[in-house]
Amino acid sequence: ALFNVDFRDNSDGYAVGGGGTILRTENGGLTWEKVNNSYPETLKRVDFADDKNGWIVGYGGSILRSGDKGRTWVRQSSNTSARIYGLFMSKKYGWAVGEKGLVLKYEK
């Protein structure tokens, strides 16, 4: 199952879902390809702060970051194993929320 989609512009978009699924489109969603990664956790939300920097959150405290327009994703430390369900990113700030009242803040 897929849980969330975010487009950086009219063409480039990403979708995330169960089993660590990350899909990418470069043609406005006409076709999608799987982004290779080694993260087995369910991924719930993807959000790009700008054209270059993207974030993904999910189960097991998963936080992934991309600084290359989503071509590669690197795991970030969250210091939690809680499920993270929601995400908001801007160029300067980020917020993630999850189970049991979890609130995480990022400041650039």
Locate each region found by the language model.
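Residue-level hotspots at or immediately adjacent to binding/recognition sites across diverse folds
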Residues: 1-108
